[in-house]
């Protein structure tokens, strides 16, 4: 990531890495001078429309089915506040703080392009909230992903008006109290501003963007887990020979093969073709093809994310020439399909990891103790870890069903096909989280299996050696069930993935590709 303390918004060049810095590391945000000028120019056009009582959707008319109802100059402000109050109808659990911060950031970046007609002061209020850590409480459920994320974004706006709820310094309080404590004045919305703040795809985009970032990291962890399992099972290294992969030339496949070879470099655990057996099972032999396909999938989705976080998804838009154009940039379909694709890619990483876990614990498939239990019978060892992993991958298979093929018409059939992109993004996030736990289980089991071969004098590879060290610093070899509560050990392994310690340690020894 860039070594920066502040992210400058231009509306054109926000990166996924910068989004993560703001969302998770608390980096500050500021508008570029170019963005300020663009916002001011676009606002002049809206002021002219209101002053001259021109008919423009969402400025001097009602919304959705009420687009044919004219609104007087005197009621334009009331129209915008009414919009926020009525549209804030989310339900269910609240988004995590990092997602809320990503939502606020991406909405501010879209508005900074200067096509929405918002006042500079209103945009600055949103940025001040982000910088001060006033985080609106936004429900996860209630968006169709078209017209954008209306309900959840309305919840984002409520504290700006002294309404709703927000988290501030770790405490949930009323929106007004949070704004007062942070020293940020409550605002009144002017013409077009309510619509400008909520008509966009930022909730689905922010949720999916963080899932993409986590999936990229997780795929590297997947390669580490696979390499450790290959060593634990004395797998055949010939399957990763670059001569095999260059003749199929998918980037993800070739990168995965190179990663495995880097990780196992110098290993005496691995074998050659014909040494112990002629071929390994698919879950070992086909790691480049399986992991590689997911890498290519996620690279595609990342490309789409970086377009979307620098896009205008408002309606109507205000052009540089002074025209106001109604269109459909709020429609979430361009991201709904990629986020469904992301879920499929992440689910497959968990699928193959669980299959490798089975090969580690099933004594009928290896020469290791049943369920990796040193004293089996009285002790069950890793028996039920596979049950738990199987439950997660089966849940992922349900979650991987695409949301974007579904639609329910809304607003009296004016909005007759919607994207369900926010559901797609939320599902992808959950799939990535489940996959993390499955990989953590495989990593633990692989280290347990390796310890059963410790007396044979084998050496781990250049990269896997570092992974093994990090895991063993946190988690001991499990000899007796009475020594542990398995979920706590799995929690430790999962945290090594979440906090990045595992990947950081390995990448100091070998540079992994994505």
Swiss-Prot record:
It catalyses: L-histidine = trans-urocanate + NH4(+). SUPFAM superfamilies: L-aspartase-like (SSF48557). Contains an active site 4-methylidene-imidazol-5-one (MIO), which is formed autocatalytically by cyclization and dehydration of residues Ala-Ser-Gly. Pathway: Amino-acid degradation; L-histidine degradation into L-glutamate; N-formimidoyl-L-glutamate from L-histidine: step 1/3. There is a cross-link at residues 146-148 (5-imidazolinone (Ala-Gly)). Its EC number is 4.3.1.3. It is found in: Cytoplasm. InterPro entries: Aromatic_Lyase, Fumarase/histidase_N, HutH, L-Aspartase-like, Phe/His_NH3-lyase_AS. GO terms for molecular function: histidine ammonia-lyase activity. The modification 2,3-didehydroalanine (Ser) is found at residue 147. The keyword Cytoplasm applies. One of its GO terms (biological process) is L-histidine catabolic process to glutamate and formate. Gene3D superfamilies: Fumarase/aspartase (Central domain), Fumarase/aspartase (N-terminal domain). It comes from the Bacteria. One of its GO terms (cellular component) is cytoplasm. Keywords: Cytoplasm, Histidine metabolism, Lyase. Belongs to the PAL/histidase family. This is Histidine ammonia-lyase. It comes from Clostridium tetani (strain Massachusetts / E88).
């Amino acid at each position: 990531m860039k070594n920066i303390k502040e992210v400058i918004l231009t509306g054109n060049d926000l990166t996924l890495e910068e989004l993560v810095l703001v969302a998770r590391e608390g980096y500050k945000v500021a508008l570029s001078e170019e963005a300020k000028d663009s916002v001011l120019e676009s606002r002049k056009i809206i002021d002219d429309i209101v002053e001259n009582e021109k008919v423009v959707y969402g400025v001097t008319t009602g919304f959705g089915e009420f687009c044919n109802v004219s609104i007087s100059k005197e009621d334009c402000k009331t129209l915008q506040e009414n919009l926020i109050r009525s549209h804030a109808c989310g339900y269910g659990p609240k988004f995590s703080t990092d997602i809320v911060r990503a939502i606020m950031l991406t909405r501010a970046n879209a508005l900074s392009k200067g096509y929405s007609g918002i006042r500079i002061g209103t945009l600055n209020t949103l940025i001040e909230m982000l910088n001060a850590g006033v985080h609106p409480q936004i429900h996860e459920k209630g968006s169709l992903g078209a017209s954008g994320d209306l309900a959840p974004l309305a919840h984002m706006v409520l504290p700006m008006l002294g309404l709703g709820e927000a988290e501030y310094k770790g405490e949930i309080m009323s929106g007004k109290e949070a704004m007062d404590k942070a020293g940020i004045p409550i605002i009144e919305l002017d013409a077009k501003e309510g619509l400008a703040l909520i008509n966009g795809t930022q909730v689905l985009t922010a949720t999916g963007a963080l899932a993409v970032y986590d999936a990229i990291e997780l795929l590297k962890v997947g390669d580490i887990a696979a390499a450790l399992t290959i060593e634990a099972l004395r797998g055949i290294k010939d399957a990763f020979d670059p001569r095999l992969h260059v003749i199929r030339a998918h980037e993800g496949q070739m990168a995965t093969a190179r990663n495995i070879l880097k990780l196992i470099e110098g290993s005496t655990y691995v074998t050659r073709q014909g040494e112990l057996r002629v071929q390994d099972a698919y879950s070992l032999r086909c790691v480049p093809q399986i992991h590689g396909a997911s890498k290519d999938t996620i690279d595609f989705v990342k490309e789409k994310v970086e377009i979307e976080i620098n896009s205008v998804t408002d309606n109507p838009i205000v052009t540089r020439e002074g025209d106001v154009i109604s269109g459909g940039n709020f429609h979430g379909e361009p991201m709904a399909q990629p986020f469904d694709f992301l879920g499929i890619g992440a689910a497959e990483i968990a699928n193959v990891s669980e299959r490798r876990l089975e090969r580690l614990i099933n004594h009928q498939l290896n020469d290791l103790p049943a369920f990796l239990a040193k004293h089996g019978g009285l002790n069950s060892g890793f028996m039920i870890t596979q049950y738990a992993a199987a439950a997660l991958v089966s849940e992922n298979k349900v979650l991987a069903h695409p949301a974007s093929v579904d639609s329910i018409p809304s607003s009296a059939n004016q909005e007759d096909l919607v994207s369900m992109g926010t559901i797609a993004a939320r599902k992808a996030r959950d799939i990535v989280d489940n996959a993390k736990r499955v990989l953590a289980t495989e990593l633990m089991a692989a280290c347990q299996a390796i310890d059963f071969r410790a007396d044979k004098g084998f050496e781990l590879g250049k990269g896997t050696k570092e992974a093994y060290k990090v895991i063993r610093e946190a988690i001991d070899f499990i000899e007796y069930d009475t020594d542990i509560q398995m979920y706590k050990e799995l929690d430790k392994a999962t945290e090594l993935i979440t906090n990045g310690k595992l990947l950081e340690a390995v990448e100091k020894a070998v540079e992994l590709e994505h």
